[in-house]
Amino acid sequence: MPASPQSSEMFIGLMSGTSMDGADGVLVDFSGAQPAVLAAAHTPFPAPLREAFGALQQPGDDEIHREALASNGLARVYADCVATLLRTASVTADRVAAIGAHGQTIRHRPGQYDGTGYTRQSQHPALLAELTGIDVVADFRSRDVAAGGQGAPLVPAVHAALFGAADETRVVCNIGGISNISILPAAGTGRPVTGFDCGPGNALLDDWIHRHRGTPYDDGGAWAASGKVDESLLDQMLAEPYFRALPPKSTGRDLFHPGWLQSLLDTYGNAQPQPVDIQATLATLTATAIAQDVQRYAPEARRLIVCGGGAHNDFVMTTMANQLPGVLVQTTGDFGVPVSQVEAIAFAWLARQCTRRAPGNVATVTGAAGPRVLGAIYPR
């Protein structure tokens, strides 16, 4: 007889990040000493859905209607991803305890306006539960924000479990649409895990190459590598106050969006750098923001472990390595965890924590008043 969902240790994690290219999903078994990924899948966004979420990153007309329809569309993409996972693993829905669904971030303003601020991950978890027949856990970030935190990053606890070491400080870096780092002190030092968002990851790079070459991303960073970094433009980018702000801090596409880049390019008038050189400069910005934060906040680290789509960008990876002499730059794949699966694993784990009424945040990372149970449950 299959295990009931209440006793099962199988959870699904679904992540659609700020790159807005699609949904990454994993089916994870937490019954062993280490989580075991039973299946993984990527379901691309249809072009209209990607365009809808892109438009929702900035204020516009009839937002409530457009956001509601985009949420419905995302639920259907998520449901397709779940179906692929179950089919691949030959697992039936009634054996899965819950789905941890992140949603699509369209605004992230913690601590702003009224002292509390807000974060908005657009999705329709009730529809997802209806389509899959599985309990859904969603809205992970808002409780941390309500407790005075940034609501991000939420993955450092999982980074520590998967990649922490007894004998050395390590930094785990996720390069999605936005980049973030988790600083994992050597076990026994008594120092807490910390982490924060560094700045833009792939988002501006993907937007720029799509605008000029019609491709969704810069494969391997080849286009960036063929250009020349514009040092003046890079300096202007790095003058953004966010890079000087102290942790805890978090950011998103509502700051680092195409309009942010265009406002810098407008200062050049008709003497703007060539598009390929802007791509090289954007890639260098991603690498430099990460490298500077590693040097500033984890100078003792000798290992940087990278995950997310940016791990496939050879130009970014090489630039980071050049800026961090003495630091071994690796990927999570070197530790047996594919770079595309880490965040989805994290949201499967967060769903598990929620169903057990156990905290999911790390207050030293987010700045929240303390540990909190994250997420809201939508029964199947």
From Swiss-Prot:
Gene Ontology biological process terms in this record: 1,6-anhydro-N-acetyl-beta-muramic acid catabolic process; amino sugar metabolic process; peptidoglycan turnover
A Pfam family that the UniProt record links to this protein: AnmK
UniProt keyword annotations, A-Z: ATP-binding, Carbohydrate metabolism, Kinase, Nucleotide-binding, Transferase
Pathway: Amino-sugar metabolism; 1,6-anhydro-N-acetylmuramate degradation; Cell wall biogenesis; peptidoglycan recycling
Binding site for ATP: G17, T18, S19, M20, D21, G22, A23, D24
Signal peptide per UniProt: none
Domain of life: Bacteria
GO molecular function, one term: phosphotransferase activity, alcohol group as acceptor
Catalytic activity field: 1,6-anhydro-N-acetyl-beta-muramate + ATP + H2O = N-acetyl-D-muramate 6-phosphate + ADP + H(+)
CDD domains listed in its UniProt record: ASKHA_NBD_ANMK (cd24050)
EC number in record: 2.7.1.170
Gene3D superfamilies recorded: 3.30.420.40
Family statement drawn from the similarity comment of this UniProt entry: Belongs to the anhydro-N-acetylmuramic acid kinase family.
Task performed by this protein: Catalyzes the specific phosphorylation of 1,6-anhydro-N-acetylmuramic acid (anhMurNAc) with the simultaneous cleavage of the 1,6-anhydro ring, generating MurNAc-6-P. Is required for the utilization of anhMurNAc either imported from the medium or derived from its own cell wall murein, and thus plays a role in cell wall recycling.
Protein name per UniProt: Anhydro-N-acetylmuramic acid kinase
Gene name, Swiss-Prot/TrEMBL: anmK
